[in-house]
Curated annotation (Swiss-Prot):
This is Histidine ammonia-lyase. Contains an active site 4-methylidene-imidazol-5-one (MIO), which is formed autocatalytically by cyclization and dehydration of residues Ala-Ser-Gly. Its main location: cytoplasm. There is a cross-link at residues 141-143 (5-imidazolinone (Ala-Gly)). Its EC number is 4.3.1.3.
Length: 507
């Protein structure tokens, strides 16, 4: 059980919510603020004075006054008309994060929503009845309207859900959770729809996957150093301290620890090779830059996870209703775009190491890592697959945040595209996962070919894991299943856990 304290979520909590079957409860200390916000909205609605989002239309229709007897219909219509998403359902882990983030935002008491509505969301979460939310349809301002409308429609008994993973109607989902359809009061529909929770949830979910890939890439890169008989001198702490970037310093320390005591390395310390290619030698510089970007993105997304991104905002102490733009997801878009750069670069560097290993001139290994080359092609086309994926990532890494299209009759004339920025991270991560799987296979093959010497004690379990699933490549065979089984292990963090390094979300 995780207790959600609105405004004080942590990255480890968010990772657990995404990855583990934890349940949620709201910190009772938040109840007074929630109730005060709901009362403030009810008082404003009762007075009848125009207040955006409470008794007016929305967007370009904000100047249209809505009579008191139509306020409930206004909120219902808002939810139903905005539920226009398309595409595949959002991943279960992302939906769990979305619900937790929405509860945190609403729980700070500036949205004017009743506790009854929040209790319904928590009940659905804990019953494993998750809204079916189409992943496409948000431009990231005014908030993630379409995705959050699909979330909200379930509370009305409209739309679809997943009941413990099985697709069903919203009404069936409510029944399983012991709930009845809700009637939303003034502003509640808008409070549910307005916010950056979809884009932030997608960005966080994919960030956790990219963090796992980063750690895997440290391991794969270190194994490739041994496979290529590379030097450990470029990882000397003194080099990296002189530059001063913390990510670079931390990455170099990881490579030193992973390669410590390697018999392969010790066997060629007195060779006449002067310098390794950049894909080996500059790993701390490149991976360090990726690490710095990822840490910054994590900081931004944690702030956003704890934010109130509704509009308008209710200030119960003064009775004021202030319209602003906290729904604009530009910080999320920038963070996601930075994560895309890092994830793509992790894959790009791994692809270069694969290319190095299969090149006999650079690695000193048999061409394409196979004996009897010619009749056997070995890793030749596995590298082509890695190159295709790395190239695709370069296109996917183009920033989404540089684009904007006006919506709502030019009332909403600049948008963030944060949801697309966050969503495409999943494709980049999947591509990078498969590139790393190919590198791990190639590096393991190279290490085998260095016999009788072995890799380091830290990397020996990696070799055992790989060889427990895929035998040494002797002759050409149907190769795709080998890549698939190692990619599955990458996704399960089998190699990431070997890295002597952890992110803030794992602590």
């Amino acid at each position: 059980m995780i207790t959600l304290t609105p405004g004080h979520l942590t990255l480890p909590q968010l990772r657990r919510i995404a990855r583990e079957p934890v349940q949620l409860k709201l910190d009772p200390a938040s109840f007074a603020k929630i109730d005060a916000g709901a009362k403030a909205v009810a008082d404003i609605a009762a007075k009848g004075e125009p207040a955006y989002g409470i008794n007016t239309g929305f967007g370009r229709l904000a100047s249209t006054h809505i009579p008191h007897d139509q306020l409930e219909l206004l909120q219902k219509n808002l939810v139903l008309s905005h539920a226009v998403g398309v595409g595949e359902p959002m991943a279960r882990s992302s939906v769990r994060l979305l619900l937790a983030l929405k509860l945190s935002s609403l729980g700070r008491g500036h949205s004017g929503i009743r506790r009854e509505v929040m209790d319904a969301l928590i009940t659905l979460f804990n019953a494993d009845v998750l809204p079916l939310i189409p992943v496409k349809g948000s431009v990231g301002a005014s908030g993630d309207l379409a995705p959050l409308a699909h979330m909200s429609a379930v509370l009305l008994g409209v739309g679809e859900v997943f009941i413990r993973g099985e697709r069903a109607s919203a009404l069936d989902g409510l029944r399983v959770a012991g709930l009845a359809p809700l009637t939303l009061q003034a502003k509640e529909g808008l409070a549910l729809l307005n916010g950056t929770q979809a884009s932030t949830a997608l960005a966080l979910d994919n960030m956790f996957a990219i963090e796992d890939l980063y750690r895997t890439a440290l391991v794969a890169g270190a194994l490739s150093v041994d496979a290529a008989a590379g030097s450990v001198k470029p990882f000397d702490a003194r080099i990296h301290e002189l530059r001063g970037h913390q990510g670079q310093i931390d990455a170099a320390a990881s490579y030193r620890e992973l390669l410590e005591g390697s018999p392969i390395n010790q066997s060629h310390r007195d060779c006449d090779k002067v310098q390794d290619p950049y894909s080996l030698r500059c790993q701390p510089q490149v991976m360090g830059a990726c690490l710095d970007q990822m840490r910054h993105a994590a900081d931004v997304l944690l702030v956003e996870a704890n934010a109130v991104s509704d509009n308008p905002l209710i200030f119960p102490d003064t009775g004021e209703v202030l319209s602003g733009g906290n729904f604009h997801a530009e910080p999320v878009a920038f963070a996601a775009d930075n994560l895309a750069l890092a994830a793509a670069e992790i894959g790009a560097l791994a692809e270069r190491r694969i290319a190095l290993l299969i090149d006999a001139t650079l690695s000193g290994l048999p061409p394409f890592l196979v004996k009897d080359g010619g009749v056997n092609s070995g890793f030749m086309i596995a590298h082509v697959t890695a190159a295709a994926l790395a190239s695709e990532n370069k296109t996917l890494a183009h920033p989404a945040s540089v684009d904007s299209l006006p919506t709502s009759a030019n009332q909403e004339d600049h948008v963030s595209m944060a949801t697309f920025a966050a969503r495409k991270l999943a494709d980049i991560a999947d591509n990078t996962k498969h590139i790393l799987a190919i590198e791990l296979l190639a590096a393991a093959q190279g290490v085998d070919l260095r016999a009788p010497y072995h890799t380091s004690p830290k990397l020996a379990p990696v070799m055992e894991t790989i060889r427990g699933k895929v035998a040494h490549y002797e002759l050409d065979h149907y190769f795709a299943p080998d890549i698939a089984v190692i990619a599955k292990l990458v996704g399960e963090r089998a190699f990431a856990k070997v890295a002597p390094f952890s992110f803030a979300s794992e602590q």
